[in-house]
Amino acid sequence: MIQSSQPMSLKLTCSAFRLQRALRFLLGRLPWRVASGARRFRRWLNRYSYTVLSSWPERALISLKNRSRFLVRPNTRNRAFSWTCRAARSKPRPRRSTALPRSQASSSRHSWAEFLKFRKSFQMSNTSQPDPSRPGTERTSSKEAGCRPLGQLDSFSWAARPPPGAAGLAVSEGFFRKIRSSAPSSPSFSRALMSNTYLCFLTTGPRSSRENTQKSFPATSPREPVTSRLRGKAPALSPSRELSFTSAPF
């Protein structure tokens, strides 16, 4: 009888080490080890799925899919079957959203991108454009001129240029402090203002401030009172009314 040179304890230790090495992602490991092992198995299955599943008969695949009903939930049945038995796509394509049709989704995405571009250009378009009729002032360009009320246009469209020197520095500090204090303090007001701006953008579209001001106001000086405009245009009386005034008895 031939006796082995290695003791039994060493043989058991080696076999246990081999078993633990073969199944290291399942025996006494942490959850991320199990997830890495599942990813390895899925990668191996995707690599050899064409050779393995092509040899399987169709009945075996159908029975495997039917048995998966008792193991997974109905809403995850197809996903689990695709993870285990379906082959990976050679050329994956981005999936479309099923919430909206493609035309409506693309149009809404395009309109939102246009609105964001319009908002960014509006924030960056406060460049000074001096008016030739008034050399002491400058006009700030605004693409929302057609959607603002009359009071906001009068208070935001014209700004006096501060004179140079220490007095001009004090005036500019007071001017910028007034601008900061006029900003909305509550988030609900700013959110409502943004929603109104977006609705105005959808209805009117991005137009230049010069076109909006020409449509909303006549081409006159902004400080000219309304009474002077009305004085220049006297109402013309018809000849019948003039005759009635002259022929009336006193």
From Swiss-Prot:
Composition bias type Basic and acidic residues, residue spans:
136-146
| Transit peptide (first-last residue) | 1-48
Domain of life here? Eukaryota
Q: Which UniProt keywords apply?
A: Mitochondrion, Transit peptide
Residues covered by region (Disordered): 86-108, 124-148, 204-250
- One cellular component GO annotation, for this chain's record? mitochondrion
Q: Does the keyword Mitochondrion apply?
A: yes
Q: Where is the composition biased (Polar residues)?
A: 241-250
Does Electron transport count among this protein's keywords?
no
Write down the InterPro entries for this protein, in alphabetical order. Answer: GDF5OS (IPR039711)
Would you tell me the protein name for this molecule? Protein GDF5-AS1, mitochondrial
Q: Which organism is it from?
A: Homo sapiens
